[in-house]
């Protein structure tokens, strides 16, 4: 008797969300099952196809919930299967806006939305109301603020068509009124018009890879502030399959934050090998599939993650004898297209989901790639940050922390060659975000520069770089940081500055660069100063 196991990694916040099953025609015998988590999908355990007749199928799933247990009936075989569900714990994002009004909270136990009503007035947004879906039923929400006499056209969300809310952008008055002035909603399919005025301080409610399932905030005669509850957005899987039962090596990378790089090896007939560099919360994870032949052609495609995502994969198939993937082409959210790897045929396929980016791949292979599928999630809202080009040498591997609201702490490790380690503590929505370690702080002296956030912010970085003994490319030798209030001590070696990273009327809210055994490059991400 064959045994199979599908492991779920709770350390990655992976949760079982559904089970698909296949029953033998004319009986209650379950002949195959397939498990789906919020991150990946298992192979089919057992049989999907029946020898006589088509199997009946069943699904165990409840929107917005996870499976926490099973029940069923069995004798010599498994005859029935049921599941116990509970709500997936949401993430609460604090309310953005002014401090006035009375607190309200719609809660988070919803699957999604059907309609959003918003009414503007002379002083800003007067009124907001959300109609939710709970346990598959329409739930009318409570109004927040004061509704005027004018009729309000709702922003409709087609929950039945798997449409869901992924972000809210708006503006609020920082003066005494503290009222939200304008607001705009974005789903995985469309974006509403801006309701109200584009004035005041801009805010955003969004979380990469998550959807909004509820709101909270403060209101009186107007809407003073708005916050949201998030849960993991559905994972979309698309595949091209030959349907061949002869290829038995199934692989599934699962899903990550995004794709950083793609490597392909190919000859004139087929794609022999693929390798993907994924981003796993700032760390690179490699996955490789197929046969690594050293004598065939090779190519790579680098993605500027987190500012860029692969949005589609175009491929062709060999149709003689076995059907192998003959060519692959990748397109990104920035409108870039990779080289075509392989020799295209007339048999084409496309992996693409509108408004989404690729976060993982799966497929079948042996001596070449036979089937290919991809996991998609909605693209994150475009960042308002601007990237200032990194300075330094070309050594090491690229890293990019992205953009936040500000900088809280800077940690610098240095040795006799220069800067070997950097780490930053950021601020996002008044919460501390711990950046990744870049380099190794083992046996190094690590110094700290702490900013008095939120009143103090970083406006420039000056430094120097040079070739030193033991390094083939230039390394960062010195760094010094300047805020709106003061200048830090010098980190590293006393040398003449050779670069300054800054942009007029902007503050630094993130860092990027290249790191190996030493820091080779450093650059910054900036936002306009609005304070």
Swiss-Prot record:
> What are the protein's UniProt keywords?
Lectin, Repeat
Cross-referenced SUPFAM superfamilies: Mannose-binding lectins
Q: Which InterPro entries match?
A: Jacalin-like_lectin_dom, Jacalin-like_lectin_dom_plant, Jacalin-like_lectin_dom_sf
Note one Pfam family from the annotation. Answer: Jacalin
Recorded superkingdom: Eukaryota
Asked if Repeat is a keyword of the record, the answer is yes
The Jacalin-type lectin domain covers which part of the protein?
1-87, 90-232, 235-378, 385-528
Q: Name one GO molecular function term.
A: carbohydrate binding
Under the heading CDD domains, the entry gives: Jacalin
Record-linked PROSITE patterns = JACALIN_LECTIN
Does this entry carry the keyword Repeat?
yes
- Family designation: Belongs to the jacalin lectin family.
Name the UniProt record assigns to this protein:
Jacalin-related lectin 16
Q: Which organism is it from?
A: Arabidopsis thaliana
């Amino acid at each position: 008797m064959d045994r199979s196991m599908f492991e779920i990694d709770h350390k990655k916040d992976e949760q079982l969300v559904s089970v698909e099953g296949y029953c033998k025609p004319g009986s209650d015998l379950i002949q195959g099952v397939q498990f789906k988590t919020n991150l990946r999908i298992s192979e089919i355990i057992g049989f999907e196809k029946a020898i006589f007749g088509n199997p009946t199928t069943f699904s165990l799933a409840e929107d917005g919930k996870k499976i926490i247990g099973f029940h069923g009936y069995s004798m010599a075989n498994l005859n029935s299967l049921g599941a116990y569900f509970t709500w997936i714990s949401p993430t609460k994002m604090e309310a953005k806006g002014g401090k006035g009004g009375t607190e309200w909270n719609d809660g988070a136990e919803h699957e999604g939305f059907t309609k959003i009503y918003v009414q503007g007035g002379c002083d800003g947004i007067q009124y907001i109301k959300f109609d939710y879906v709970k346990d598959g039923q329409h739930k009318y929400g409570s109004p927040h603020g004061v509704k005027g006499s004018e009729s309000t056209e709702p922003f409709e969300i087609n929950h039945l068509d798997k449409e869901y809310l992924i972000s809210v952008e708006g503006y609020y008055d920082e003066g005494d009124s503290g009222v939200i002035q304008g607001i705009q909603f974005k789903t995985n399919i469309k974006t509403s018009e801006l309701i109200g005025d584009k004035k005041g301080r801009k805010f955003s409610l969004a979380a990469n890879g998550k959807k909004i399932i509820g709101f909270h905030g403060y209101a009186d005669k107007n809407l003073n502030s708005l916050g949201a509850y998030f849960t993991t957005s559905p994972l979309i899987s698309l595949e091209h399959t030959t349907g061949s039962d002869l290829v038995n090596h199934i692989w599934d990378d699962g899903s990550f934050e995004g794709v950083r790089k793609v490597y392909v090896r190919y000859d004139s007939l087929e794609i022999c090998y693929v390798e993907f560099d994924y981003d796993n919360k700032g760390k690179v994870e490699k996955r490789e599939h197929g046969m690594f032949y050293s004598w065939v052609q090779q190519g790579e495609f680098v993605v500027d993650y987190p500012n860029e995502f692969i949005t589609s994969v175009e491929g062709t198939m060999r149709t003689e004898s076995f059907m192998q993937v003959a060519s692959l082409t990748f397109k990104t959210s920035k409108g870039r297209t990779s080289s075509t790897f392989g020799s295209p045929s007339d048999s084409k396929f496309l992996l693409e989901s509108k408004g989404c980016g690729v976060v993982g791949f799966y497929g079948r292979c042996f001596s070449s790639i036979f089937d290919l599928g991809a996991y998609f999630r909605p693209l994150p809202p475009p960042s308002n940050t601007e990237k200032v080009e990194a300075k330094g040498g070309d050594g090491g591997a690229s890293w990019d922390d992205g953009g936040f609201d500000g900088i809280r702490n800077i940690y610098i490790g240095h040795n006799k060659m220069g800067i070997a380690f950097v780490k930053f503590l950021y601020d996002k929505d008044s919460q501390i975000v711990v950046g990744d370690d870049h380099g190794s702080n083992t046996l190094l002296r690590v110094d700290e520069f702490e900013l008095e956030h939120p009143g103090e912010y970083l406006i420039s970085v000056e430094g120097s770089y040079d070739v030193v003994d033991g390094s083939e490319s230039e390394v960062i030798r010195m760094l010094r940081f300047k805020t709106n209030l003061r200048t830090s001590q010098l980190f590293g070696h006393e040398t003449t500055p050779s670069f300054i990273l800054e942009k007029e009327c902007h503050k630094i809210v993130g860092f990027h660069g290249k790191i190996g055994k030493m820091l080779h490059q450093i650059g910054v991400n900036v936002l306009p100063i609005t304070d």
